[in-house]
């Protein structure tokens, strides 16, 4: 029997956390982990600038987290493989990104992402966090 490894997975139960940790270690000048499954810019912009946040499931890394950095996203909230992050995790990110200029939340048009975003925006509104939501069109990866 061969000992050749065919995958870069240590533990399937921890794949998302390990992928994000590895990504942050590989690009420390661009990103850091602010909390579990929350990727933010290594060098945040000022409170006078709108924070741009997005969310989505893992499984295509670096996927959305690959867009976190100067001139792009400020924060990416990552769910489990092919699953949206929960509303509480997104709300945690919105609290981290709260600033005077507000937050633009870019939501991919997948049912779980939309549901989590709607719930997190309601929680944010109750706390006085200014969030504007932008719903994008679906990509065609799910098939027609």
Regions found by a protein language model. Name each.
Residues 1-4, 46-55, 64-77, 142:
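Gly-rich Lys/Arg/Thr-decorated short loops/hinges at beta-loop-alpha junctions or inter-strand turns
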Residues 1-52:
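N-terminal amphipathic/basic leader segments beginning at the initiator methionine
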Residues 31-32, 43-47, 53, 65, ...:
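Solvent-exposed alpha-helices and their adjacent loops that cap or buttress functional pockets
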Residues 57-62, 79, 108-117:
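Gly/Ser/Thr-rich loops at beta-strand to alpha-helix junctions
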Residues 60, 64-100, 138:
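Glycine-rich oxoanion-binding loops at beta->alpha junctions
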Residues 67-75, 120-130:
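A glycine- and small-aliphatic-rich helix-loop capping segment at beta-alpha/alpha-beta transitions
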Residues 98-100, 112-116, 128-144:
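Active-site histidine-anchored catalytic micro-motif
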Residues 101-109:
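A short, small-residue-rich loop immediately preceding and capping a beta-strand
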């Amino acid at each position: 029997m061969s000992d050749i490894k065919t995958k870069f997975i240590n533990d399937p139960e921890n794949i998302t956390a390990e992928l994000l940790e590895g990504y942050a270690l590989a690009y420390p000048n661009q990103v850091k982990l602010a909390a579990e499954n929350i990727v933010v810019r290594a060098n945040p912009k000022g409170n006078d600038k709108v924070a741009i946040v997005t969310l989505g499931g893992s499984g295509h890394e670096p996927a959305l987290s690959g867009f976190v950095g100067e001139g792009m996203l400020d924060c990416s909230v990552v769910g489990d493989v092919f699953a949206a992050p929960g509303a509480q995790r997104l709300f945690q990110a919105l609290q981290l990104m709260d600033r005077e200029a507000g937050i633009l939340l870019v939501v991919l048009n997948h049912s779980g992402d939309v549901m989590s975003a709607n719930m997190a925006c309601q929680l944010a509104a109750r706390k006085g966090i200014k969030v504007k939501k932008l719903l994008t069109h679906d990509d065609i990866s799910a098939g027609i």
